[in-house]
Amino acid sequence: MDFKEKQLSSKLIYDGKVVKLYVDDVKCPNNNISKREIVKHNGGVCVLAIVDNKVILEKQYRYAYDEVLYELPAGKLEINEDSYEAGLRELEEETGYKAKSLINYGKMYPTCGYSNEIIYLYVAEGLSKSQRNLDEDEFIDIEFVEIDKVIEMINQGIIKDAKTICLISKYLLANKK
């Protein structure tokens, strides 16, 4: 079966700083016409950094959920920015650690039902202490947590962030003994 839908029309509803919202008319595989509300986003990066056998976790308030969340260092891609370079930049800006290199752990689609956002996943190598340089609207605490404790935090629902859970899981699966 051909699952692909054909776009018939697209209307920009909202053009924001971070996202654009479109309402598209599509022709479904069964020839029915349907609407798709699509959030277009430039994408982001997520970086797992381990210092002295401890994972760098960030703790920050997330307005959309009205709660403080634990996450791995991450951030938005600038327009036409390479995800590898963005990973290096975000890690240093948010944590004050500079990576010599990043290992590509693939990508994830965090909200595939209604958004085109892609988050690129990396693991940092060759870390050295540098300087934090947070954006003026970022307020982030850094914690260094043993990997076993991170797994426990995921299993207990303390870590809820999808990109963080995804990258930690991929890392553990790739490095299981």
What residue spans do the PLM features occupy?
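Conserved Nudix-box catalytic region and its N-terminal flanking loop in Nudix hydrolases
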Residues: 2, 45-89, 132
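Acidic, metal-coordinating catalytic segment for phosphate/diphosphate chemistry
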Residues: 9-46, 51
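The catalytic Nudix box helix
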Residues: 72-104, 122, 134-137, 146
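Nudix hydrolase/Nudix homology domain
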Residues: 2-5, 68, 79, 137-177
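Short loop segments at secondary-structure junctions
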Residues: 29-30, 51-54, 61, 124-129, ...
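Short, solvent-exposed loop/turn elements at beta->coil junctions and helix N-caps
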Residues: 11-12, 106-111
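A generic structural signal for well-ordered coil/turn residues at beta-strand boundaries
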Residues: 15, 20-22, 43, 115-118, ...
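Active-site-adjacent beta-strand/loop module that shapes the phosphate/pyrophosphate-binding cleft
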Residues: 22-29, 111-130, 143
